[in-house]
Swiss-Prot record:
Keywords: Amino-acid transport, Phosphoprotein, Protein transport, Transport. Residues 718-825 form the dDENN FNIP1/2-type domain. GO terms for biological process: amino acid transport; protein transport. The modification Phosphoserine is found at S401. Involved in extracellular amino acid uptake. Required for the trafficking of the GAP1 nitrogen-regulated general amino acid permease from the Golgi to the plasma membrane. One of its GO terms (cellular component) is cytoplasm. This is Protein LST4. Disulfide bonds: none annotated. The keyword Phosphoprotein applies. Residues 1-25, 423-444, 538-569 are annotated as: Disordered.
């Protein structure tokens, strides 16, 4: 609730300012940052990135990309509703400033604000002269840009009242942290005030950031507080060294006051200053931007039947298209999350689930399936937007007339969602030839067929032989391979490779639709070593991926856009390319089979209306209800004994009542969404569930992030799912201490006041749960969970295949099966 109140006070005037250019070193690589010492007024270019010396894992080239470009433009509306519960998600804009339609446009001004990279560091010391007007000394002043901006326009002398507050001293030497907004500006001031030895010698560390980041300050306070503590220790170390130096020279007495103003910290301690700045620039600020700008997944309530129907149909499509009759990849992955990671990811903040894939559409579909098994889910009511049935029917008729769709029975389309866009199955070869003559000129990639103009496109190098490869007698769920590779002499090579594929494998072009009994068959086990291996503390050189799309990926990182890769043979099994919106025209329409009719109007989640932004759900109704109950309480709301104390001239009437916080109150809808997100162009250390491009670079970033997590914990864990190689790995990394120095065994090494050093080694343990189509060695509990998941999916398949069952009974049974999966560990 505090975040909502803070957000409502945030002004939107600063968000609408467009920047013609940006010279921030965080945005543009190899641009120097400028560090200015207030005492001398000189500028010098900062040295290289010097970060934490405990575990040297970061390099300047590995700075996390946290800018959220309009990547949602490449996602269909149906998939947006699955992942986020809304078609429109505003970037860096409070909910109370949204338009009446519940969303914003995708223009660059409202989506991206590059000035959120800017920040300012101020270190100010009180001179101890109460009667003097100039009672404060500027020790250090740093900003991210040499260009004059709103942060530099405010002089430090104008900030002293906001930093130190009242000149009245407290009786004890207390330390305080303050967060406040600066009037008539779009800035937030975060300040820590502490003392060294004297009451009248206060020191302030102030961080000035754009007010657009205020809603995520509370969530990211642990990283901000850690940076303030490190900076405070650094300044105290400077003062201690200066005091020891004065004691050795005989210039120190009991009445002497050690001042930072007597130390030129920029000249004497350049390395420490660089560590302070770069830690803020490469860790804290990217974390704030990630929390603010990257959209988070919305976990639907488990009692929302429309979501449950869509979720089961997504599972059926994945198994039929991706897994094949014998693979069992998805049931094993679901069982791994249900039995283990569902609880681990909530209790262990350093645990992560990462999907590695070169196809954004595939990864987002799998994220939707897996996120439904995680907690915490939304427990409030979901608003369903009403619409005119007559307008829907007219829209459907227009779609049929424009696209000339072939009518199909309702039962044949029951397992398809509107985002799949698969080609329909022909009844036989004769009907196939007859229907081809009646197909209209609208192709798969035409705007009439897809609702989006921007899409995940295959590079449209067209030639006369471009066509769609479709096997005879194939079903609706078969993988349709695009013939976007070169024709000519190489065509026989690809044809022979497709024919040589085994007819039952998940990558075969000629795989027939399996029966329900063929979906779940045991796969051969894979033995491996599960012992802990010692890991080097220093990271090696990062290896670049050698895929054909690496050059385009590198270009897309600089342009902050989602990489659009050309297909390769190893990526054909990741999902049908026909399911991507805005695909180019493929082949001659006279040889293409008829299309499935557009069933987007039957998508169960199409009328979901959720007010949210990137990180929070709007709960204005709950706030209004709570304030009404406080201001106008009723006897029913009190529900217990109460007492009223009459007021007097000093205070108003006071009502006291018993507070009984039960489980029902604690399970109220959560405003802040969990740190689960979608497919990102780079791996992001600040999210626990995500997808990113496959390659050595992503795996290196994941390993480095696990080492960074060990700076504040002794154990971290990640579940890596590679869709390209069909690989599931459970990677655990822990830190074992080998020695004990300074007799600090009774202190917590992660305490901010701990100053000792202990030797340690990093050990890594990797379990191959699934590799190369084979299931690894599983525990008994995991095997039981896999069997339970398979039986549940079988029951759901038979439930949805039964056309004679009542709709209400189907809804209740589907909810029961889904609830048994979600609460499996509690029941078992």
């Amino acid at each position: 609730m505090l975040g909502n109140l803070l957000r409502n006070k945030t002004s939107s005037s600063g968000f609408e300012k467009s920047s013609e250019h940006s010279d921030f070193s965080s945005v543009v690589p190899n641009v120097p940052v400028y560090c200015k010492a207030a005492s001398t007024g000189t500028t010098k270019t900062a040295a290289g990135a010097l970060l934490d010396t405990a575990v040297n894992v970061e390099k300047p080239s590995e700075m996390l990309s946290t800018t959220s470009p309009p990547i949602l433009d490449h996602i269909s509306d149906d998939l947006k509703l699955k992942l986020f519960g809304s078609r429109d998600i505003p970037y860096s804009r409070p909910i109370d400033t949204l338009q009446n339609n519940g969303g914003l446009g995708t223009d660059k001004i409202t989506s991206i604000n590059e000035k959120t990279y800017a920040f300012r560091i101020l270190i100010i010391e009180e001179a101890g002269q109460m009667a003097c007007r100039n009672n404060y000394r500027d020790i250090f002043d740093y900003t991210t840009s040499k260009i004059s901006n709103s942060m530099e326009q405010i002089r430090p002398s104008e900030l002293k009242e906001y930093i130190f507050g009242s000149p009245v001293r407290s009786s004890d030497l207390t330390q305080c942290d303050k967060i406040r907004t600066i009037p008539n500006s779009d800035l937030v001031l975060i300040t820590r005030i502490f003392y060294y030895t004297h009451q009248y010698n206060r020191i302030a560390i102030s961080l000035c950031i754009p007010r657009i980041l205020l809603p995520v300050v509370a969530e990211s306070w642990s990283s901000i507080s850690s940076w303030l503590t490190q900076t405070q220790k650094m300044l105290i170390g400077f003062l201690t060294k200066n005091r020891i130096m004065q004691e050795n020279t005989g210039n120190y007495s009991n009445n002497s006051v050690i001042k930072l103003s007597n130390i030129d910290i920029r000249t004497h301690y350049p390395k420490e200053i660089e560590i302070m700045v770069q830690t803020l620039q490469k860790r804290v600020i990217p974390g704030l931007r990630s929390m603010s700008e990257i959209p988070r997944l919305f976990l639907y309530p488990e009692t929302f039947k429309e979501f449950v129907h869509v979720w089961f149909k997504s599972i059926f499509n994945w198994i039929e298209i991706k897994d094949g009759p014998k693979l069992g990849f998805l049931p094993l992955l679901m069982a791994m999350i249900i039995s283990d990671y569902r609880h681990t990811i909530r209790e262990l903040k350093t645990s992560k689930i990462v999907i590695l894939s070169g196809n954004m559409v595939v990864a987002n579909k799998l994220l939707f399936i897996l996120s439904a098994l995680l907690e915490p889910k939304y427990k409030g009511q979901i608003t369903i937007r009403r619409e005119n049935i007559r307008s829907d029917s007219s829209a459907v008729s227009r779609n049929k007339s424009n696209n000339n769709f072939v009518d199909k029975p309702e039962t044949e389309l029951s397992t398809l969602t509107s985002t799949d866009n698969l080609l329909s199955r022909t009844e036989n070869n004769s009907n196939h030839n007859c229907n081809n003559s009646n197909v209209s000129s609208n192709s798969i990639g035409s705007p009439n067929f897809h609702s989006l103009r921007k899409g995940w496109q295959i590079p449209n190098r067209r030639n006369s032989n471009t066509s769609v490869s479709v096997s005879s007698s194939e079903s609706l769920a078969e993988v349709i391979q695009p013939s976007s590779f070169k024709s000519g002499s190489s065509s026989l090579h690809y044809l022979s490779s497709s024919i040589s594929s085994q007819p039952g494998s998940y990558g075969s072009w000629f795989n027939k639709r399996p029966t329900i009994s063929q979906f779940f068959q045991p796969s051969p086990s894979l033995k491996h070593n599960e012992s802990w291996e010692r890991l080097q503390t220093t990271a090696g050189n990062m290896q670049r991926t050698s895929s054909s799309s690496s050059l385009q990926q590198a270009t897309s990182r600089l342009s902050l856009t989602t990489p659009q890769q050309s297909p390769s043979i190893s990526e054909y099994d990741e999902y049908p390319w026909m399911g991507t919106p805005g695909s180019p025209n493929v082949g001659d329409v006279s040889h293409a089979p008829p299309l499935v009719k557009n069933i987007s109007y039957k998508f169960p989640l199409k009328n979901v209306e959720l007010k949210r932004d990137c990180q929070r759900i709007s709960q204005d109704d709950l706030l209004d209800e709570a304030f009404e109950r406080i201001c106008q309480p009723s006897l029913a709301d009190l529900n217990s004994t109460y007492e009223i104390f009459p007021g007097n001239s000093s205070y108003a009437d006071i009502l006291t009542t018993d507070s009984d916080i039960d489980d029902g109150l604690m399970n109220k809808p959560l405003e802040l969404l969990p740190k689960y997100t979608m497919y990102l162009t780079h791996f992001n250390n600040f999210f626990q569930l995500q997808a990113c491009p496959a390659g050595q670079e992503s795996e290196s970033r994941i390993t480095n992030s696990m080492k960074i997590d060990l700076l504040k914990a002794d154990y971290t864990r990640s579940l890596l799912v590679s869709l390209r190689s069909r690989d599931i790995r459970d990677v655990a990394l822990k830190r074992e201490f080998t020695g004990n120095n300074n007799n600090n065994s009774n202190q917590n090494i992660y305490d901010e006041n701990f100053v000792g050093k202990r030797k340690y080694v990093l050990k890594q343990k990797t379990r191959k749960i699934f590799s190369c189509g084979k299931i690894g060695k599983l525990s008994t509990s995991l095997e039981n969970c896999v069997n339970f998941v398979e039986n549940s999916i079988k029951s759901a398949m038979m439930l949805y295949d039964d056309n004679g069952i009542d709709s209400e009974l189907r809804d209740s049974e589907a909810l029961r099966i889904f609830s048994s999966l979600v609460h499996y560990c509690n029941a078992g």
